[in-house]
Amino acid sequence: PYICSEWEFGGLPAWLLRDRNMRLRCSYEPYLNAVKEYYSVLIPKLVPHQCDRGGGVILVQLENEYGYYGNDTAYLEFLRDTLRELGVTVPFVTSDGPWSEPKFKSGMLNGALPTGNLGSGAEWQFGQMRKYIGENKPLMCMEFWNGWFDAWGEEQHTTSPEKAASELDELLKRGSVNFYMFEGGTNFGFMSGRNGGSKTGDVTSYDYDAPLTEDGQITEKYRLFKEVIAKYTDIHEIPLTTEIRRRAYGRISCTGKTDLFSVLDKISVPVKSSYPLTMEDIGQDYGYILYRMKIRDIETVSEIRLEGAADRVQCYHNGEFVYTAFAAVSYTHLRAHETLMN
């Protein structure tokens, strides 16, 4: 159920957090019940498309890098058994980072092939995996990181096509490979997530510097990958006839505008509380919340500090925009009876 992928909440629905006792990705019964209900709708749609029935689904991954998160084997067993009950017959896999033996082994499970996620150092990392899984199982890189994602305020990540092709060659000498990513994508709307430890969220584009760009353009990385793969298997030439069109839309003239504070009563309903409410408290999964407070009974406030914001914060003082931040925000010389909004 958890996919990471820099997708909002790793693909888990926000409403799970309305349970103040919620424990994710473990044997917490309300979480397992939600997973089972979700799978009961999703899996029957996938079962007919498994490769043993003429379809394209060749493997099913139980979790995603679970060894980094926990070691609840009973939870992984629940996923495995539930999927089997619902008709999954193709092999199961797990995926973790080979560079950490404890974390890799925490994600392993009987009845599932352990695979590794990596972007370089195939000889050493596959060597580590061989120690963990023994001599009789195939080696596979489930996520070959041939690029990387971008966060707001950072430089765009790119990787050398030549170096990426060399890493691919080293992987194919030793085992099997699944590209992450083969084609770049887009996390529209509020669906882009945030990497653990990062101060800013990820951008809408998930181009990833992949072999095929976000809009399907062929890159030098694609051409070099094709040459490497041709060393290990026959590649049939396919004419690439689809024209990928790009267009410059030029300037757009804005003929009218309004501001948030003049239309608040038309787009939302106020909720009053003596303390800040979370999005889960008011049943809002996505979008924005406007928090407002008045500073009272103090002649002068030298500084107000906002701490612990879990996401992007835009702050206004008396209706005027002040600051955007992802961390602590400070204000100086705010006087009594003035309104602070964020």
Predicted feature locations:
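Active-site mouth of glycoside hydrolases
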Residues: 1-89
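The substrate-binding groove and active-site-proximal loops of carbohydrate-active enzymes
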Residues: 19-35, 62-71, 117-118, 147-161, ...
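Substrate-binding cleft/loops of secretory-pathway carbohydrate-active enzymes
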Residues: 68-82, 88, 97-129, 189-193
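Catalytic-core region of carbohydrate-active enzymes that cleave or remodel glycosidic bonds
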Residues: 121-211
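Extended carbohydrate-recognition surfaces in non-catalytic/accessory domains of CAZymes
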Residues: 194, 206, 217-220, 227-302
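Aromatic-lined ligand-binding clefts that engage carbohydrates, nucleic acids, or primary amines
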Residues: 301-317
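A cross-kingdom feature marking solvent-exposed beta-strand/loop segments within repeated
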Residues: 316, 321-331
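Conserved small/polar residues in nucleotide/adenosyl-binding loops
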Residues: 332-339
